[in-house]
Amino acid sequence: HHLVRTVPPSGRIVVNGLEESLARVLHTGCWSTVSSFGAAVSDFSAVGDPQAFDVLHQGAAVARVQWSLTGVHNQLNALAAIAAAHHVGVPVPQAAQALANFQNVKRRMELRGTVNGIAVYDDFAHHPTALRTTLDGLRRSLGADARILAVFEPRSNTMKLGAMKSQLPWALENADLAFCHTAGLDWDAADALAPLGVGPGQRAQTAPDIDTLVSQVQQAAKPGDHIVCMSNGGFGGVHDRLLRALS
């Protein structure tokens, strides 16, 4: 709430209308104009797939966004950007066109290469919610029949502590196969992933080092697969090592 209080009455607060916690914060006191996005009753909302959707302003369709980014989280980011731009005088159709020309940043579903029909991506996702939104976005883009292989390392401090390990099966629901790099962990990753089934031929596997991890993925991958490597670090150069192994 301190952050809300620092915004002057002449300012604008752009808030995710889907988050009840934010609504509670604003309810404790707000002296600025608020623009909401995301929910159907918000000032700015979306109808359609995250890669191609109509933008509604106060319930009326005013523009359409077609871009390369996937996932509901990116759709919400787009609405937030449109709302902020609208506040400073940018017409919504102009903002939507700018998003159509937007080139995504590095390490956000960045395609590192394709070999033998197998695509390898790099993504910065490093906690369960980020893993889930990344994989959900790819699943929505590819459809139900494509195979997604999630390769990840719990590298952030909270993940190393195991504070969110119970959420990993939920985070990986949209992955056909999951491979976890376990170096440096003080908790049992195989136990945390047990609901998925762990071991050779199962839905999930664990690896104590990068060499083992690359070998596991190489043996499992097939033409047409999409491999998503997720970490907030360098991940031992696993992306390039996978591309070499798969070639």
Locate the predicted segments by residue:
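Extended acidic/charged loop-beta regions that coordinate divalent cations
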Residues: 20-64, 105-112
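Flexible active-site lid/hinge loop adjacent to a nucleotide/diphosphate
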Residues: 1-27, 68, 128-132
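Active-site donor-binding loop signature of nucleotide-sugar glycosyltransferases
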Residues: 39, 67, 209
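Short, hydrophobic beta-strand segments that form beta-sheet elements in well-ordered domains
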Residues: 12-17, 33-38, 178-180
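Internal, well-ordered alpha-helical segments in soluble enzyme and binding-protein domains
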Residues: 3, 21, 74-80
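ATP-dependent carboxylate-amine ligase
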Residues: 30-33, 60-61, 70-73, 79-247
